[in-house]
A protein has these predicted regions:
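Sequence/structural signature of beta-propeller domains
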Residues: 2-7, 12-318
Length: 318
């Protein structure tokens, strides 16, 4: 008869200690909080208060969530981080840091923090290539690995004329591999209510326009499995602080868009402290988990003690 393997007390306690340490580290990297239920196509699952020091720093401005729950973040301070989103059922309960590091230039050298390191949007192409859009020096870099060199790819034509702090903040990959990009505060001279936007790929961009709500600016976009786009829009005033809204395009808006088309969305979520927290909401991601579609939102703390890095998680029920 085969004997069951015996585990020594020392090995058992070591394994238990490692598990406890991992759990404590996950809890230290993010503290969960509950969200109220809301009507509409998004079912709130919960939120996390992130600990940026466990992720290499704050200032998160772009996010990607993979089906295996790997959360990838970029910062407008020029670094990236990976962590595992921990769920109890579908409720977020913690974040397990995996690795982090600086974004690098084409020679593999860390991009100096400051003007050149203002990374604002993150997307992943079907072949696994990461695309990172930068403001101030408006450009897009492509990375096979985020810890490797990042080569320039052709940005949308005319983007160099965008205001220093108003370039690409929204970058998303459609199911057919095309990119959807929106500039934050880059407007046509005769239509200040619009923002320059594009569909296509490096070297093959089709110019469009995005129309945000009055007073709002687009900060990120993600694509639902049915091809509709979610666009995150933010507003700030000295008296009112931050507020945001998440909007959704019509079913055929991206598929049928032609050069010069004006795209807009319908509001599906408000983030203005009633009842969801009002913060500097910067990034949105969509992924599939089994038969569920998950939507994640990330706020940018600007590395300020007056702001927070938050993650909100929703299940799509639209």
């Amino acid at each position: 008869m085969a004997q069951e393997p015996r585990v020594s007390r020392r090995a058992f306690l070591a394994a238990l200690g490692a598990t406890s340490a991992t759990s404590a580290k996950a809890q230290h990297a993010a503290q969960p909080f509950a969200l109220p239920d809301l009507p509409g196509p998004l079912r709130p699952l919960g939120g996390l208060v992130l600990a940026p020091d466990m992720l290499g720093g704050g200032g998160f401005s772009g996010v990607h969530l993979a089906p295996d729950l790997t959360l990838t973040l970029i910062s407008d301070r020029g670094h990236w981080a990976e962590a595992r989103l921990l769920l109890d059922g579908l409720t977020p309960i913690g974040l397990q840091p995996l690795r982090h590091g600086p974004l690098r230039d084409e020679a593999g050298k860390p991009i100096p923090r400051g003007f050149a390191a203002d990374a604002e949007a993150l997307a992943r192409r079907p072949d696994g290539t990461w695309l990172v859009a930068f403001e101030r020096r408006h450009r897009i870099r492509a990375y096979r690995r985020l810890d490797g060199p990042g080569a320039y790819v052709a940005a949308p034509p005319g983007l160099e004329a965008a205001p220093p702090n108003g370039g690409l903040e929204s970058l998303a990959v459609l199911q057919d591999g095309r990119l959807f990009a929106i500039a934050e505060i880059f407007t046509p001279p005769d239509r200040p209510e619009l923002r320059h936007a594009w569909l296509g790929a490096p070297g093959r961009w089709t110019p469009l326009y995005w129309q945000p709500a009055p007073g709002f600016h687009p900060t990120d976009a993600a694509i639902l499995p049915d091809g509709r786009a979610l666009v995150l829009e933010r507003r700030f005033s000295l008296l009112g602080g931050f507020s945001a809204r998440l909007v959704m395009t019509a079913h055929d808006a991206l598929r049928s868009a032609r050069e010069g088309a004006v795209l807009r969305g319908e509001t599906i979520l408000l983030l203005n402290d009633a009842p969801l927290p009002s913060e500097n909401w910067e990034a949105v991601a969509v992924t599939r988990l089994g038969d569920q579609t998950l939507v994640a939102l990330i706020s940018d703390d600007n590395e300020s003690v007056l702001q927070r890095s938050l993650l909100l998680l929703f299940a799509w029920r639209g």
